[in-house]
């Protein structure tokens, strides 16, 4: 049998046991710690309210069983991720409503408190998307396409204010598309960008 122990923070322990013709007693040692540190942008941009509202820091591992944790990012880029089972994790910056999560490193949690800073490569694109009359495009899935390389595309969903945040890996001009309709372009050069995009007139 596979025995899994779960709590409010997810899977705490999982192990296979064999039951024959007698009672079985099994103890599980659950060790967990926390990660503290600070995120900075490689491009020199500062964190904004938009960044910290729309992005989180996440830890994820696959072995010996899947486990993940998420935590908010503070205005100065600092974070504290609690209740992390001992083990080695990928550290990600996760953009809300998007599929453009960015790996910023790995960390091994093997003590009560671990401290490490991480640098985010790439560029944040903060968008508020409205229709031709200025109404927010709520809960819509857009594609975000590099105009010079159509294979470089990402997808994101807007929130209840028509807003979204993506982290892209390289500068360029990108077009936001809802199905076959254009909602304008964003040009990224050397810093994070915040824009309002409006549906193009036919």
Regions found by a protein language model. Give the residues of each.
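Structured interaction patches on ligand/partner-binding surfaces of diverse proteins
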Residues: 6-26, 95-116, 121, 178-202
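A short, amphipathic beta-strand motif
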Residues: 28, 35-42, 118, 125-131, ...
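Hydrophobic alpha-helical segments, especially N-terminal targeting/anchoring helices
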Residues: 6, 33, 40-41, 73, ...
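Short, ordered, surface-exposed loop/turn motifs in non-cytosolic proteins
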Residues: 41-65, 131-150, 170-171
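Short Pro-Gly-centered beta-turn/loop motif in secreted/extracellular proteins
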Residues: 1-2, 7-9, 75-90, 96-97, ...
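Exposed beta-strand and adjacent loop surfaces of beta-rich binding modules
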Residues: 34, 52-56, 88-90, 124-126, ...
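Surface-exposed coil/turn segments at beta-strand junctions on protein surfaces, enriched
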Residues: 19-21, 28-30, 50, 72-74, ...
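Short, acidic Ser/Thr/Gly-rich low-complexity loop/linker segments typical of extracellular
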Residues: 61-80, 148-165
């Amino acid at each position: 049998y596979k025995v899994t122990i779960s709590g409010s923070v997810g899977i705490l322990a999982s192990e296979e046991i064999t039951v024959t013709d007698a009672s079985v007693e099994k103890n599980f040692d659950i060790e967990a710690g926390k990660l503290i540190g600070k995120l900075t942008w490689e491009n020199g941009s500062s964190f904004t309210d938009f960044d910290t509202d729309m992005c989180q820091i996440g830890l994820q591992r696959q072995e010996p069983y899947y486990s993940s944790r998420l935590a908010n990012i503070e205005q100065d880029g600092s974070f504290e991720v609690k209740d992390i089972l001992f083990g080695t994790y990928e550290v990600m910056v996760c953009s809300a409503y998007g599929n453009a999560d960015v790996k910023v490193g790995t960390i091994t949690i093997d003590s009560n408190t671990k401290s490490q800073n991480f640098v985010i490569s790439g560029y944040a694109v903060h968008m508020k998307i409205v229709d031709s009359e200025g109404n927010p495009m709520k809960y819509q899935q857009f594609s975000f396409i590099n105009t010079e390389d159509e294979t470089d595309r990402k997808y994101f969903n807007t929130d209840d204010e028509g807003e979204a945040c993506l982290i892209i890996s390289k500068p360029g001009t990108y077009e936001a598309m809802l199905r076959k309709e254009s909602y304008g372009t964003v040009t990224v050069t050397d810093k994070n960008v915040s824009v309002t995009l409006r549906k193009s007139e036919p």
